[in-house]
Amino acid sequence: MKMILDLDTGIDDAFALAYAIAHPGIDLIGVTGTYGNVTIEQGMANTQALLTLLGAADVPVYAGRAIDGFEVSEASARIHGRNGVGEVDIAA
């Protein structure tokens, strides 16, 4: 099944992305980035780093619509960390 994921890649979406890549019945044809747990820019950076880590760097990542003045809520930052993935440096 072809799939496009729309993510604000925090911890929860990192698991969804890994599952989609690992599932033999899913053909991940793209990811769009949105805001929520993190900004679009941070989410896209997280997504691209995870795709590389998981051996799927060829999956295209597209930015969704940004919203002016969006800031990550304190609750999201406490749950997901400022970078959305618990302050883990995925690229390391």
Curated annotation (Swiss-Prot):
Report the InterPro entries cross-referenced here: Inosine/uridine_hydrolase_dom, IUN_hydrolase, Ribo_hydro-like
As one GO molecular function, the record gives:
hydrolase activity, hydrolyzing N-glycosyl compounds
Pfam families to which the protein is assigned, alphabetical: IU_nuc_hydro (PF01156)
Q: Which domain of life is it from?
A: Bacteria
State the coiled-coil residue ranges.
Answer: none
Protein family: Belongs to the IUNH family.
Q: Protein name, please?
A: Uncharacterized protein in ribF 3'region
User: Which species is listed as the source?
Assistant: Corynebacterium ammoniagenes (Brevibacterium ammoniagenes)
